[in-house]
Design a protein with these regions (language model features):
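Acidic-enriched catalytic cores of C-N bond-cleaving enzymes acting on peptides and small amides
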Residues: 11-12, 33-63, 82-158
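Hydrophobic residues positioned within well-ordered beta-strands of beta-sheet architectures
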Residues: 17-19, 77, 113, 170
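Substrate-recognition/cap regions that form aromatic- and gly/pro-loop-enriched pockets
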Residues: 154-170
């Protein structure tokens, strides 16, 4: 038995927007995972988790990364918050962007975020399910688990959140 329908009709009086993390260095998940590079999926979900804790936010879509063995350079989500929170979300993104630019100043000199107004989604993921999804993705470890004891500098075990995709509803 399934979990039921997690989608609901678009809410009215909401600001629909896309938010993206772009310009990251990326790299191979085996060769570059120990270089301190940012993961676009993790950065995006970190921001969305903060928004969901602060505002009644709906998630419409999420998409990041393309290859199973690459550190993702870009990620994007389509969300909605009450119209009254529109400017606060923009301010929050500016603050968050400054934080992550500082955090990854050495490894991600071209990091940028974008927020754009969008047309309303036909359907949104309900807030409870979206919150659980964001928390689950946020909790996924990304990085080195263990280095080789025999070969200096060799990553032995690691985890890379390479791709976050939302399947079509059919």
């Amino acid at each position: 038995r399934g979990l039921g329908d997690v989608y609901k009709r678009q809410p009215q009086d909401y600001f629909y927007f896309s938010v993206a993390v772009k310009g990251l260095t990326g790299g191979h998940s085996g060769d570059d995972i120990n270089k301190g590079r940012a993961n676009a999926n993790k950065l995006l979900v970190r921001f969305l988790t903060q928004l969901a804790a602060k505002y009644p936010m709906y998630l419409c879509e999420i998409d990041g990364g393309n290859l199973h063995n690459a550190i993702p350079r870009e990620a994007r989500a389509l969300c909605a918050v009450p119209m009254k929170d529109k400017e606060s979300v923009r301010v929050d993104l500016n603050i968050y962007t400054a934080e992550i630019e500082n955090e990854f100043a050495v490894t991600e000199p071209n990091l940028k975020t974008e927020l754009s107004s969008e047309a309303p989604c036909k359907e949104v993921i309900d807030m409870v399910t979206a919150g659980r999804l964001l928390k689950a993705v946020y909790a996924v470890h990304n990085g080195v688990y263990a280095m080789s004891q025999d070969i200096p500098g060799l990553v032995e075990t690691s985890s890379n959140l390479a791709s976050v995709k939302q399947a079509d509803r059919k």
